Curated annotation (Swiss-Prot):
InterPro entries, alphabetized: SKA3
Major subcellular site: cytoplasm
GO biological process, one term: negative regulation of mitotic spindle assembly checkpoint signaling
Biased composition (Polar residues): 148-157
Locations listed in the record: Cytoplasm, Cytoskeleton, Spindle; Chromosome, Centromere, Kinetochore; Cytoplasm, Cytoskeleton, Microtubule organizing center, Centrosome
Region (Binds microtubules and contacts the microtubule-binding domain of SKA1): 196-402
Family according to the record: Belongs to the SKA3 family.
The keyword Transcription regulation appears for this protein: no
Keyword Membrane among UniProt keywords: no
Phosphothreonine found at: 190, 214, 260, 286, 346, 348
Annotated stretches, region: Binds the NDC80 complex: 102-402
Oligomeric form and interacting partners: Component of the SKA complex, composed of SKA1, SKA2 and SKA3. The SKA complex is a homodimer organized around a central W-shaped coiled-coil structure, formed by the interacting domains of SKA1, SKA2, and SKA3, each end of the 'W' is extended further by the C-terminal microtubule-binding domains of SKA1 and SKA3; the complex forms extended structures on microtubules. Interacts with the NDC80-NUF2 heterodimer of the NDC80 complex (via coiled coils); the interaction localizes the SKA complex to the kinetochore and is required to establish kinetochore-microtubule end-on attachments.
Name listed for the protein in its UniProt record: SKA complex subunit 3
Amino acid sequence: MDPIRGFCGKLRSLAVTLDSETARLQRALDGEDSDFEDCPMRVLHDLNSEVRILKDDVNILLDKANLESQENIGFIKATKILMRKNSMDIMKIKEFFQKYGYTPRAKKNSVDEQEVTDSKPESSECERPEKPDLKDDLLDSAAASTSVSEKSPRSPQLSDFGLERYIVSQVLPNPPQAVNNQKEEPKILTPFSKHSLLKTPKCALKMDDFECVTPKLEHFGISEYTMCLNDDYTIGLKNVKTNSETIETEPVPNDNVFATPGLITQPLGKNNAEHTHSPLAPTFCTPGLKVPSTKTSTAMVSTNSSSNDLETKESTSLVSNSDECFENFADPSSPTISSYENLLKTPTPPEVTTIPEDIRQILSKYNSNLASPVAVRAVSPINVFLPRHGGQNMRDASNKENW
């Protein structure tokens, strides 16, 4: 009884499992099972998202292709316009050149020529030896046609630019008589004679025969000790003491005052390196002012000394001895100034009647007698410059007071 019970229990459990499985499968087929609801929706969502992405990519690619096509279309249109402009410019240039004798070249169909030459190579070879006269005639006609077609270039005229009204008619006075008077002389064309030129002998150049001649070195007396002392100002300074005997000094006046150095002159007879021609004295055109002469005091007084001085030529030394200059100092004569009446455009001198207060205070420090203001008498302008007294002038006196 136990095995039968076990077998029946197993059959019952198998039947229950079969019923449950069939019911689950039926619900799954009908879509009522909750386990199979999420998978199709998820797959559909994924597919939908992928389709959208692909659609966006396709739209982007289409936009790019559309832009490229538009750019290509614009480029093609621009090239067409440029081709038209170029063709118009070429036609204008051809028309302009044709006015001056330019002939455009005829286009030749190279393809047709190749076909003709390939089809009849033998016939052309046979015709050449048989008909030489025809060939010569063709060459002559071709040469004539090319000479006619190729016009000689001519110079531009006003009619080419639409300026015919500015053309000046150049008519000869008697053209027929001039033509009749001219006699045609036969031109004798002599053949060009070729002069026979002598051939130059050929010889091999040997460098051993020629020696490189270097310039001869000559000593010019230049060394590190004498390179700065060759006939320049330094040599003049060195030789000035040796040539002091030949130097002449101007006479000194008898005034025992501090003198200015005068010019040391020497005659032009010597052409030493230390002496050169002295320039002429400058002439001043200031009215009423006479430049003091650096020559002797007696030369300024005499009136005929200027003409005698121009005749005699003198030269000055480049270097003067300092000892002699200090010994021969002389007081230059004061410039002679004419009266204010003879000067041109000279203002009248101011008349000073009293000493100003500030100047009086300064003068009172040096002189106690000027304690009170003193009336100053007007002095004529002629007596402003006082003469010398005992070899001294007023300038020296004022200088002694300041000392």
